Amino acid sequence: MTMFKKAVKSFQWGTYQVTMETGEIARQAGGAVIVNVDDTVVMGTVVASKSAKPGQSFFPLTVDYLEKTYAAGKIPGGFFRREGRPSEGETLISRLIDRPLRPLFPEGFLNEVQVVVHVLSINPDVPSDIPALIAASAALAVSSIPFAGPVGAARVGYANGQYLLNPTRTEQATSELDLIVAGTQAAVLMVESEANQLSEEVMLGAVVYGHDQMQTAINAINDLVCEAGKPEWDWTAAPKDEPFIAKVTALAEAPLREAYQIRQKGARSDKLKEISKEVMAKLSEEGDVDAVAVSDIMFEIEAKIVRSQILNGEPRIDGRDTRTVRPIEIRNGVLPRTHGSALFTRGETQALVVATLGTARDEQIIDVLEGEYRDRFMFHYNMPPFATGETGRVGSPKRREIGHGRLAKRALIPVLPSAEDFAYSIRVVSEITESNGSSSMASVCGGCLAMMDAGVPVKAHVAGVAMGLILDGNRFAVLTDILGDEDHLGDMDFKVAGTANGITALQMDIKVQGITKEIMQVALAQAKEGRLHILSKMQEAMGSVRTELSAHAPRMVSFKIHPDKIREVIGKGGATIQALTKETGCSIDIKDDGTVTIASTSAEGMAEAKARIEGITAEAEVGKIYEGPVVKLLEFGALVNILPGKDGLLHISEISNERVKEVKDYLAEGQVVRVKLLAADERGRLRLSLKAAMADEGGTIAPLAGAAEVATEAAPATGESA
């Protein structure tokens, strides 16, 4: 007899065996489901408040995806040996889970909801993001919380003309597509992808394929709900105060219609604030007014005005039709001492983007559950509050900034040169200086131009455009290059980036409960039209990559040494390479295969570092004459340094043709002499001759005069020298 009422559902999904279970762990949560996909195990939990907070004006949904290092059999680093703040990867997956879940909560539901997903075990070949999304969806489905799910999800790859369902990491390495699609049984809600310049037809096919394949997971969740689901809350939205809505509408609708004829964002925003104050003042004359309720009603009026105008074929907020891209201006090389820069302005959205080149040691080291890896391309997106004419917090990036940076990075990765063709690490930073919609796509355009300005040999220009949607029953309008207000008042944010040859990144977020294949088809076709227009403007501004790097960018040279010589270059405790770095001002990296990369802004320093490393790793050549200092006197001869780290024995009999009684009579420590290498044995011991060198080059050596006076008579060198 067990105390648990456990329900388990298993199903085959592509190559994976998937198990979902509930009822044993985290029983006090509103809903908890553990999903096991070939030993990648995640636990999704959800808890909701029974009532909304007084004055609550938005839906407070939070999603936290947390990776535990014990899942990979590791102990965390750091002094405290425990997990710290969420990593960038955890933040991105938290957003990935949030986006398809949020539209499925009922309108007017303002209770606080918290979804927490823990990774409990990880199979390095099975990514945890899809299991995490399935677990969160299943936890909501079995709970009592009002939710129009369940949501399914699938990862789609594309190789050899075939779609791949939930490819492993090994399969993903050869795939031309990494696409995640999430949705309900009826429609698609969210798409996130990176592609190798694939056509619109292939991308749409991948979305449809993924939606079809996710039905297996949705059906399994429904089966789990039938067996273990809790009764749904008896929740209904608060009744609308129709008389009050009518009163606000009578006061606000006409002036709001006038305000939305103002084409400039700042002036329009000021007018909207003025109208809001006037409406509040008139309502306050009749008694106390709920400011939140008035704001919500005015938002609905604004949405109705803007949406109806667009659906009726009238001009958009800024006067454009549905297909026109805002005016574009581009400047390259705007910052004098950066490696590459571009100022990309599209309407009232502007990005100042800077590219910086670095060496291998500047690569980002990323430690994830699956192991450690290095990333040579970094893209960081920042949007300070002044970009929208507001005040606010300035500091570490928020979730939105991390997500936008990742999207821009995805768009540019497919056109980057390989490390073999371009050994630099690359960091691109997009500073949004103005924002009125589509700032992430402006970052893509500016990022491509900044890299070209820096001399990065990208394969093609990349542009991005954000599409919007107004949907009312069977009527819809797709909008090219949406404004911030159109994003706010519309039903879709559909971002497409790519080259003239195809799509490199696609991201879609839906605010309604899904869209059809027809709408996606129209959006993709219209996005291509907009993208090609933007690409033409970028090509006018900068037709090709700069052939020379900035004078302030590091130059690099790579060459090979024998792997056995690496220890000699590094030296004891790193002493040799540290001295080289300090004395030449160069950055020096050595790979295990013996590849040495030297980087410096100084050509002289780089040449010196290379010469010294070649000297350290050079092999002594029998019969060659070398010049070097006497490092030690012995009774039977002297040690002479002929190459860095290589000393040879100059026997007393090889100093002079005359009989030498005392070595110190002819040589002193520090004295520079020219010697010939007579022999080298298998143990690396070197036998030198001073008299043989003199015989080849001419000259004599006389006894030293006095204790410290060196009397060396040497003819000009005629033989080889190091």
Swiss-Prot record:
Molecular function as annotated in GO: 3'-5'-RNA exonuclease activity; magnesium ion binding; polyribonucleotide nucleotidyltransferase activity; RNA binding
Subcellular compartments: Cytoplasm
GO biological process: mRNA catabolic process; RNA processing
EC number: 2.7.7.8
Family the UniProt entry places it in: Belongs to the polyribonucleotide nucleotidyltransferase family.
UniProt cross-references to PANTHER family, sorted A to Z: POLYRIBONUCLEOTIDE NUCLEOTIDYLTRANSFERASE (PTHR11252), POLYRIBONUCLEOTIDE NUCLEOTIDYLTRANSFERASE 1, MITOCHONDRIAL (PTHR11252:SF0)
Protein name: Polyribonucleotide nucleotidyltransferase
UniProt gene name: pnp
